[in-house]
Amino acid sequence: IAFMLEDLATAESLLANYTPESKYLPNLACVYGLMARVYMWDEQYANAATYARKAIDASGCTPLTKEQWLDVNNGFNNINSNNAWMWGIKYSPENMGNLCNFTGWMSGEADWGYSSLTLPGIDKSLYDQIAFSDFRKYTFLDPDRSVYPYETCRDQKWIDDAVDYQAIKFRCLGGDWEDYAVGGAVDVPVMRVEEMYLIEAEALGMSEGVDKGVAA
């Protein structure tokens, strides 16, 4: 822990006045986010809350909207389509295969990777705990497809035939589910501002009481 925090303290000083050309490179807010993660893992909750808040404030980021979360073409695949991602990496179509790429593992809509066979989804008991007022629930297919007008880059038959509770969170870039070099050339989130809000809330709850965490 001490070694990691020492390195992060060095990064904090070196990146203090640095503005990267894109979010593919970390900035000071990302350093604070990493420090929040380390402190949270080490159960130093007060410090975790402090650095999560510093990450939020320094990032200038805002949580995803419902429209961004459920976007058929850009959902969780385009760093420039939202203001929530603090840091990400990008796949290049020149150095990826149909199997060795993030979307091929995570997107059930993709037709080129293992995900079309493994059908990633959510456990029923966890799904049932998510309120229908929480739009994040709609990235998983309810057994009763009429509860929400699910959208996909495929067609309605694909929605109807998909397994219950299948995930449609990670989308193919531009909605291209057939060409891995296009639909799989996505951005992958490394750090999002929502994570910092969750760390702050949990850390405050652990250090100052549940009410403080709920209010965060």
Where does each model-flagged region fall?
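Structured, solvent-exposed acidic/aromatic patches
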Residues: I1-E194, M206-V214
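Active-site-proximal region of nucleotide-activated glycan assembly enzymes
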Residues: A201
